[in-house]
Amino acid sequence: MTSEVIVDVQTKEISIALLEDKRLVEFQKEGRSASFVVGNIYLAKVRKLMPGLNACFVNVGYERDAFLHYLDLGSKFNSYTKYLKQVTSDKKKLYPFSKASILPDLEKDGSVQTTLQQGQEILVQIVKEPISTKGPRLTCELSFPGRFLVLMPFQDKVSVSSKIQSAEERARLKQLIQSIKPKNFGVIVRTVAEGKRVAELDSELKLSLIHISEPTRQEAIS
């Protein structure tokens, strides 16, 4: 079976079509919003290091800088940093996570001063929306939730929701996902995946990978 994904990016919306043997099997259309909501991913710029807080302020294009603590860089920050350099070196070429190198984990007791530099560009995801006078709260440990699955780059583990109580079903889902998941991705199987066929899960997985290869990228304002 030959799979093909077509992505049409317009000013106000993005359309994604999944074809199998030239036959349309799934179609999605999403609006492009400028709102800073939880889950959005941005190419941000470090604005100010705060050694006393072991944190920094980051510009994601919002009127107020976002807050990023050292611990929210995540264990795979080194891998994300190298990946971003490879992606930005040739913006016309897609560089999937599955082809990226996994570097040693970031030290848990490290500091922003030795890890980040003012003006450095980083990939971030919003985990808390702006409130009143505060900007968004960020993480660099990206996750991509779908209806059935949550994908996590540079991980490898497959976990099944604890709400799926059947040992047989948990084993089935774990074995199934391990057989179809791409390299360099960890997966969390959500409760609603219980009883789903491999075709349904594989279809969502393929569409999720397209979203991941073209993340929302809002250039930080210098």
Which stretches of residues belong to each language-model region?
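Short, ordered, surface-exposed loop/turn motifs in non-cytosolic proteins
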Residues: 221-222
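Single-stranded RNA-binding surfaces
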Residues: 1-213, 217
